């Protein structure tokens, strides 16, 4: 796997979230379907951030070739290959990703507390849970912020 595949995965997840969001906003979508779509959007959103943080780390460490043979995967596996976004962010900062210091959600909190809470609460297990606080409106703000992070990382770490 080449490190650019992290960027490609993030892009695919972002496109999927936007399409699912359009479907969830559709007035003809039934409530049960809307709830499932919102949960799927929320679940995928974390993988956009996770993939882009991995991309930034690999880019800043000049990883070339197979990522599985690189330092983050071989030597720091338990700190790099995690689903905890704050742990991954801290690992990125410790490994030269200083351009991430002021991105939304981590050190610079989002101005909308509901949007910030979505980020703070994200974890893989939510795929299997019911979240009553998810709505297309709040997820639209959340995905828009994540897209901003995606663009920022893309600009700072594409070599």
Enumerate the predicted regions with their spans.
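Terminal alpha-helical segments
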Residues: 1-159
């Amino acid at each position: 796997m080449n490190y650019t595949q992290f960027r490609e995965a993030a892009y695919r997840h972002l496109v999927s979230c936007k399409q699912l969001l359009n479907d969830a906003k559709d007035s003809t979508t039934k409530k049960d379907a809307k709830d499932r779509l919102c949960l799927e959007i929320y679940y995928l959103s974390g993988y956009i951030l996770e993939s882009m943080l991995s991309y930034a780390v690999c880019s800043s460490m000049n990883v070339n070739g197979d990522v599985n043979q690189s330092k983050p995967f071989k030597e720091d596996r338990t700190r790099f290959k995690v689903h905890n976004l704050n742990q991954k962010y801290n690992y990125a900062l410790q490994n030269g990703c200083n351009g991430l210091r002021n991105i939304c959600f981590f050190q610079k909190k989002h101005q909308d507390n509901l949007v910030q809470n979505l980020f703070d609460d994200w974890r893989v297990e939510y795929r299997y849970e019911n979240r009553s606080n998810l709505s297309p409106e709040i997820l639209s703000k959340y995905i828009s912020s994540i897209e901003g992070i995606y663009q920022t990382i893309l600009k700072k770490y594409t070599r």
